Amino acid sequence: MKIVLHPAAVADLSAAGDWYERQRPGLGVDLIVEIERALEVIAESPTAWPRWPDAPTELEIRRVLLPRFPFALPYLIQSNGIVVLAVAHEKRRPGYWLRRAKRRKR
């Protein structure tokens, strides 16, 4: 299934990658590699992952948790593909990205 990253998710990813890279060279690259793997898993089986607990029931929003980093990838399943809504830190600003899904609802 086709996957696209919401433009704001690209910004999330860039900010997180830059932060980790400043903490230790190579760590930002590790984050990006882990996210790429998660995207492959989502594409292979988008409905295998749990629904986002606080998402509106009318939206098909699911999530993948990254095993090594404290991030989740919330994604919206649509008839024409999957939209990754955010690279969301698990402990910061819960649900800040939900408005991105509401704007994309089709």
Annotate the PLM regions.
Residues 21, 59-60, 88-90:
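Short alpha-helical segments used as structural interaction elements across diverse proteins
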Residues 37, 44-82:
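Basic/aromatic recognition patch in beta-strand/loop cores that engages polyanionic ligands
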Residues 15, 45-48, 93, 100:
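Acidic, low-complexity intrinsically disordered regions
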Residues 16-20, 39-42, 46:
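Hydrophobic recognition helices of helix-based DNA-binding modules
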Residues 29-30, 50-53, 96:
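Short, hydrophobic secondary-structure boundary micro-motifs
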Residues 1-34:
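Arg/Lys-rich, positively charged N-terminal/basic patches that mediate binding to nucleic acids
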Residues 66-106:
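Enriched for short, Lys/Arg-rich terminal
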